[in-house]
Each structure stands twice: as structure tokens, then as C-alpha cells.
Swiss-Prot record:
CDD domains named in the record: L-arabinose_isomerase
Keyword Manganese: yes
Name this polypeptide is given: L-arabinose isomerase
Cofactor binding summary note: Binds 1 Mn(2+) ion per subunit.
Pathway(s) it belongs to: Carbohydrate degradation; L-arabinose degradation via L-ribulose; D-xylulose 5-phosphate from L-arabinose (bacterial route): step 1/3
GO biological process, one term: L-arabinose catabolic process to xylulose 5-phosphate
Homology family: Belongs to the arabinose isomerase family.
Catalysed transformations (reactions): beta-L-arabinopyranose = L-ribulose
Gene, per the UniProt record: araA
Keywords annotated in UniProt: Arabinose catabolism, Carbohydrate metabolism, Isomerase, Manganese, Metal-binding
Molecular function terms from GO: L-arabinose isomerase activity; manganese ion binding
Organism, as annotated: Clavibacter michiganensis subsp. michiganensis (strain NCPPB 382)
Length: 505
């Protein structure tokens, strides 16, 4: 049994330096020393989230090919960074780049920041040739169709490190999805279209394994929870949450809280034993469960599990990826759903929530643990955490199956404080203003056919999802402050043509 983690500590990125034997041993030694220094600066930078491992300078085709194969075989290696310190004839890179299956970043940099104007000679020029060595390298990558991110500048520059760090987080999300197993308890909500999808194609495209288990397999785990285990979990609830009086020990609804704890214990046991990193439930398929899982889902998401409601495994995958990509950053990631609008002119905003399952990592406050009726599902009143999402920048992201490909849509948003308290709304919630405005955002979202379930991340911005989609060779449409509906509609049409042509080629 393995506990879920979002840590990036077990991941590493290899730092590669290109050159050639033409330069001689003395120059190649300088290349090695200076490239080690660049790698060291990255490794020691606080905004670089993954370990950087320097590799010996690559000077010929055989060593480059072997490096690519070794990287492919290394589970902990989530990507490669390459820099051509000198001129490295790009035909040497063909076999290696063609074989490479890991995310790739081309760092266009050099050892020095400023030119030593008064002392520059031809030895300096021959040693520091990235300005044209990387152009040769860029050509062969483009000719081979290598998917990569290109970052330009010195690693001492904050924006350069930030861009590299963002790509590393995307590569970590890609690695996490590739090792992800999703357990679906029951099927999709009946007659719902957008939560459907091609699970076989998803395994081919993203590496994720999605399979279904009968809900009563989970019920057996819930029923096996012991009184001692439940007591310990209820003790934990009392330290973390403001519990409604009727749910406390001795209260008339305390047994409902204990059953909610049993659901959490059963779910965690099932997921850990099966090595799952994400799961789905459906209120239409609850088997012998007495409550729709609410509190348990919220707490498991907070630990790092992906989750999708109503059988929505695509959103569960996105949430798991977002949890890993945001590792160590303030904020959180959660299932979210656009519910209703505030349409007062000049004040337009969206109220988002779900029946129960919003992750408490979206708040720094102390949630309230409550019990209320639920009008669907036909079961006992479920327990859940209630809170307001912290104000601040965020992004909401959805995935749809468009028949011939998957499409990811991301909207940059600003979570805002509630205009007034919501004393009669018994669920966790978020209120946000979408960029560029509600009318344009909603029209673009509908034009894209984006899903009504999303992951809301307050940890990472849209650039992480841009890098993730690029690594995955998956369509991404972004709605932000620069979006116009006319331009967005054209982009949707262009993308349709491009992705269909790309598949054919």
C-alpha cells in the first residue's frame, strides 16, 4: 500500500551540453566546467522545483543516442534541458532526438552575462558560440518536429528561471499522469455527454489507465472500518474544523459523521491498495453506500488525489496533474463547476460550487463541517466541509473529447470576495471574475465546447497548462485578458484544421 504524494522530490531533469571534438581537450574542459556552473545555478535556485542533474558534454552521435535511451528508461527523469555551448553539428543529434520520448527544453543561454569587450579574442569567440550553435540545434529540432519549450536568457535572470521552473512543473504533471491509475466507482451520470470520453485513446495519449469498479467493492471497505479507526479520524476532524453541534460527540447526528469517516477510511484503503491516484463517483450509482461521499472526497483531494464527479474521469486526471504541478506552492486545486451568474452590469461574476466536493486547499480559513439534506442520490444526508475560496488569481481548466482529439480549455480568472454572506448555501464555493469579461469568456467557452466540470487552480497559472498541453501534443485554447470572441472563434476553426492535418501527417 502506498500513500499519495504530490512531492517532486523523486523527480530529476538532466542538463545536457552540446559541443564537438573539433575544439580540443582544453576547450572542451572549459565547456564542461562552465556548463556545470550553469547547471549548479539552476540546481541551487529556489524557483527551480526539480533536481537538476548535469551530464557529461555530448560530442558525437553515439553518446547522444545512448543518452536519449537512458533518459527514456529512467522513471525518475521527467525531462531534459539542452544547451549548445559551442557549435555542435546537428546531424549528430538526429538519432538521439528521434528516439527521445521525454519532455524537452532548449535553453538558449551562455556562460557570461556581459561581454568582456576589451579582452575578447578569437579563443573567447570559439568557446562561447551558443548564439549560433543553438540556431543549428533549433533547425534540426524543427526539421524533426521535436516538441520543446525554448527559453532564452541567462539563468541568473529571474524570468528565465521562472520559465524553466514552470516547464519542470508541467513535465512533472506529465510524468504523474503517465503513472496514474483512475478508479471509477460506477459509470457516468446517465445521458450526460461531456463527461464521456475515449478511455483507450486517453491511455495512448496521456498514459493514464482508467477502469471501473463496482460501488459495492468500496462498500465492503467502508463496512470494514473499525470503531478505533473512526474514533481517531473524528478526533482529527475536531482539531481541523468547526463542527456543527449536532455532529459532535453526543449530538443527534454524530453517527452520520462517523459514517462519513468510515467512507473516508474505506476509500483511502481501496485507493492505496490499488495504487490509484484519482477516482470518480456518481450519485446515480451508490450501491450500498448510505451517503454520497462528500467529506471523504474533499479530504482525499486535499491529500493530492484527483477526483471527478458523476463519473468524470477526464477532470479527475486534470486535478491530479494540477495537484502535482502546484506542489509546494501556496493555494490549491479542486473540482469546480460554474453554477450561476451575477449579471449586474459592471459587476458580472460567476458563483461556482458542486454538490459537495470542493477541495479545502482553496481556503486558508477553517472550514465548517456540516450536514444538510441532498435532494439527489436517494441516500442519507451527507456530511461536507463548507467554506469560501480565498480571493486571488486562478485558472479554471477543462478537458473535452472532440472525437478525433482531446481539447483542453483554460480561462484566466480572479477569485473575488463574496458580495454578501451565503448563510443558506450549504456547500463550499468560489466567486470569480473571468478574463477578459464574463460575456466574452462564456461565449468563448461555449464556442470551444468546453466542459462544465473544471479544475480550479490557485497554485499555478495558465503557462503551466500551456507547457503541459505542448508536451502532450494536445490542443489548448486559452481565454485571457487578450481574448476577443472573433479571434477566438477563428482560432477554434484553425485548430480543427491543424490538428486533423497533423494526425494525417
Amino acid at each position: 500500500m502506498s500513500r499519495i504524494t504530490t512531492s517532486l522530490d523523486h523527480y530529476e531533469v538532466w542538463f545536457l551540453t552540446g559541443s564537438q571534438n573539433l575544439y580540443g581537450e582544453e576547450t572542451l574542459q572549459q565547456v564542461a566546467e562552465q556548463s556545470q556552473e550553469i547547471a549548479r545555478q539552476l540546481e541551487e535556485a529556489s524557483d527551480i522545483p526539480v533536481r537538476v542533474v548535469w551530464k557529461p558534454v555530448l560530442k558525437d552521435s553515439d553518446s547522444i543516442r545512448r543518452m536519449a535511451l537512458e533518459a527514456n528508461a529512467s522513471d525518475g527523469t521527467i525531462g531534459l534541458i539542452a544547451w549548445m555551448h559551442t557549435f555542435s553539428p546537428a546531424k549528430m543529434w538526429i538519432q538521439g532526438l528521434d528516439a527521445l520520448q521525454k519532455p524537452f527544453l532548449h535553453l538558449h543561454t551562455q556562460a557570461n552575462v556581459a561581454l568582456p569587450w576589451s579582452s575578447i579574442d578569437m579563443d573567447f569567440m570559439n568557446l562561447n558560440q551558443a548564439a549560433h550553435g543553438d540556431r543549428e540545434f533549433g533547425y534540426i529540432q524543427s526539421r524533426l518536429g521535436v516538441v520543446r519549450k525554448t527559453v532564452v536568457g541567462h539563468v541568473s535572470t529571474e524570468s528565465v528561471r521562472a520559465s524553466i521552473g514552470t516547464w519542470m512543473r508541467a513535465a512533472a504533471g506529465w510524468a504523474a499522469v503517465h503513472e496514474l491509475k483512475v478508479a471509477r466507482f460506477g459509470d457516468n451520470m446517465r445521458n450526460v455527454a461531456v463527461t464521456e470520453g475515449d478511455k483507450t485513446e486517453a491511455e495512448l495519449k496521456f498514459g493514464v489507465s482508467v477502469n471501473t469498479w463496482g460501488v459495492n467493492d468500496l462498500v465492503a471497505r467502508v463496512d470494514a472500518a473499525t470503531d478505533a479507526e473512526i474514533d481517531a479520524l473524528v478526533d482529527e476532524y475536531e482539531t481541523l474544523y468547526d463542527i456543527q453541534p449536532e455532529l459532535r460527540r453526543g449530538g443527534e447526528r454524530h453517527e452520520s459523521l462517523r459514517y462519513g469517516a468510515a467512507i473516508e477510511l474505506g476509500l483511502r484503503s481501496f485507493l492505496e491498495e490499488g495504487g490509484f491516484g484519482a477516482f470518480t463517483t456518481s450519485f446515480e450509482d451508490l450501491g450500498g453506500l448510505r451517503q454520497l461521499p462528500g467529506l471523504a472526497v474533499q479530504r482525499l483531494m486535499a491529500e493530492g488525489y484527483g477526483f471527478g464527479a458523476e463519473g468524470d474521469w477526464k477532470t479527475a486526471v486534470l486535478i491530479r496533474a494540477a495537484k502535482v504541478m502546484g506542489s509546494g506552492l501556496p493555494g490549491g486545486a479542486s473540482l469546480m463547476e460554474d453554477y450561476t451568474y451575477h449579471l449586474v452590469p459592471g459587476e458580472e461574476k460567476i458563483l461556482g460550487a458542486h454538490m459537495l466536493e470542493i477541495c479545502p486547499t482553496l481556503t486558508t480559513g477553517r472550514p465548517s463541517l456540516e450536514i444538510h439534506p441532498l435532494g439527489i442520490g436517494g441516500r442519507e444526508d451527507p456530511v461536507r466541509l463548507v467554506f469560501d475560496t480565498d480571493p486571488g488569481p486562478a485558472v479554471v481548466v477543462a478537458m473535452s473529447d472532440m472525437r478525433d482529439r482531446f481539447r483542453i480549455v483554460a480561462n484566466v480568472v480572479e477569485v473575488v470576495p463574496l458580495d454578501e454572506p451565503l448563510p443558506n448555501l450549504p456547500v463550499a464555493r468560489a466567486v470569480w471574475k473571468p478574463a477578459p469579461d464574463l460575456a466574452t469568456s462564456a461565449a468563448a467557452w461555449l464556442t470551444a465546447g468546453a466542459a462544465h466540470h473544471t479544475v480550479m487552480s490557485t497554485q499555478v497559472g495558465v503557462e503551466v497548462f500551456e507547457d503541459f498541453a505542448e508536451i502532450a501534443r494536445t490542443e489548448l485554447l486559452v481565454i485571457d485578458e487578450d481574448t476577443t470572441l472573433k479571434g477566438f472563434t477563428k482560432e477554434v476553426r484553425w485548430n480543427q484544421a491543424y490538428h486533423r492535418l497533423a494526425q494525417g501527417l
